[in-house]
Amino acid sequence: MDIRKKQRAVVAALEDVKGREVVVYNVARHASIFERVVIASGDSNRQVNALAASVQQRMKALGARVYGVEGRRNADWVLVDLGDIVVHVMHPAARSYYNLEELWGGKEVSFKRPAAAPVRGKTAPRRRRK
């Protein structure tokens, strides 16, 4: 599977379960084993596990191999190994402490997020100026 397609699927899987602060880094120059690092935050152990499970399910549905998942028991930091992409799902405190963004220091990959659906219905009334 093309790395960009796989990357988009990972980001979509994380956003489906309300993953926060999702970033993708191109680390091909820093690591010979994988090309991308994806980092996302979850607010609770349950959400961190759900985010990792969402990535795992999406990849399996697309026919991509999941090489391993580590950290589910503790769920402060769960790592999903997809071969050419490594996904880190972390609590905000763990993310701040380990600071993987600085460690990898790779080039952040820009990706197009799907456009949000317009909200239909009544709009809030305008405020009057005094």
Where are the regions a protein language model picked out?
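Conserved acidic residues
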Residues: 35, 84
